[in-house]
Structure formats: structure tokens, C-alpha cells
Amino acid sequence: MVSATTQLKLRAADGKKYNTDVLDAKGIVLLAKSVSNQRAMAFLDWLTYSDSTLDGQSRKKAYALFESKLIDSIPVGTVKGLQQIHSLLFGGLYDFAGKIRTKTISKGGFTFCLHEYLPKQLEIVERMPETTFDEIADKYVEMNVCHPFMEGNGRATRIWLDLMLKARLQRCVDWSKINKNDYLQAMTLSVADATRIKTLLQGALTDRINDREMFMKGIDYSYYYEQQE
């Protein structure tokens, strides 16, 4: 908005409208740089797409995934499709991008599918039906339990979920409607009971499946979910 705005009129207490001072894009950048704060710098990186961290570079790749239309060629609901998403997000950043892990990993005291059983379990998940919302959500939850990659599972799998919803139900998730902590807690609980994550996802469904803004916003929130507070 600030990039396209040169002047703005607001109504004052006397009932008259006056021109206000506004900042153009360059001014916003200078303002953010003047604030000695980690969050301000993170905002600046987001605004200018200049984040040189691994996550920042991967996020740019995610944007390009939509802009290039590569996303339309990914096989939906398959392990191969998920590997392609992961490779496109993390290629050149991780040497294991798109590769199924060969080690067992854990997080927060929970051990994901043991690596020796992972190939077979992935075959089982791939064969799960995906014709209804409940089936798609169950498939997403089971793929999360598999956690097929060493890193980057959540970011890749959320796109994988949206592609299934788009192809089968003509819907996708408006991730901006799902609170980060609520989502993380629901995913933790989903190992035993998927009710909570299904409620969150269903409440955030939208038919804006071809909306560029919706996809880009979803990417921003997806990467935000992974940030350490």
C-alpha cells in the first residue's frame, strides 16, 4: 500500500479533511532501519524480500513456486508430490532436499516414524483416500506423523495439504485465520486425536484457490509457524 500511496487525506476534529504526511516504500525501509529491534529487522526483511537466512531464501522459493506455475504440475496426494515440493522449497539450501530421511528423528519428546519403517508407512499413507475433508485431514495428520524429511516437514506438508483440498474440494486453507499456538498444540494432539486440528482447518477453509494473495499470505504464515519465539 505504501508503495502506491503519495498523499492521504484524513478528517480532523474540525470536520475538515487535511493532507497527511505519508511514507513511500523507501521511507518505510529507512524507518525500520532506525529501530534497533530484532522484530523490526524481521519486518524489514519481509517487506523487502531481502532475508538472507535459510528460511528467508526458502520462502522466496515458495513464492516462486506459485509465480512459475510449477505448483500446478505436482502430483496431488502422493509421496512423490511431497518430495517435489520439499525439493523446490529447499533445493540448494539442504543437501537432503526432497530426499526421504534415513535416520530416526524426534521433536518435543515425540519420536516420529522410525526410519526403518518409513518407506512402508509412506506407501500406506499415499494409499489413504482423499475425497472428503475428513479423509484429507486424516491423510495430512498421518503424513505429519511420518515426518519424511530431516527438516522442513511442516512447510512442505502444509502446501501438500492445500493442493489436495484444492484438487478434491475446490478449497484451500486461509492460514491467517489459524493462531500459531493453537495450530501447534492441535498438531501435537493430532497424534492421538485429530478433532482439534480438523476443527481449526475446517473453520479456515476458503474458495479463493487461485488467489495469489491467499497463497502468498499462506506461505508467510506457514513459515511464521516454524519460527522460534
Put a short name on every predicted segment.
Residues 88-94, 99-112:
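Active-site substrate-recognition loop segments, prototypically the cytochrome P450 B′-helix/B-C loop
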Residues 135-169:
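Catalytic DNA-binding helix-loop module of base-excision-repair DNA glycosylases/AP lyases
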Residues 93, 182, 187-229:
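Acidic, carboxylate-rich catalytic segments that either coordinate divalent cations
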Residues 3-7, 174-182:
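Substrate-binding beta-hairpin/strand module that engages nucleic acids
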Residues 1-51:
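An anion-engaging/catalytic patch
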Residues 109-147:
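Helix-hairpin-helix/helix-loop-helix acidic hairpins
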Residues 36-91, 95, 164-175, 227:
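N-terminal structured helix/loop subdomain that forms the ligand-binding/catalytic interface
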Residues 44-46, 96-105, 153, 198-202, ...:
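Short coil/turn segments at secondary-structure boundaries
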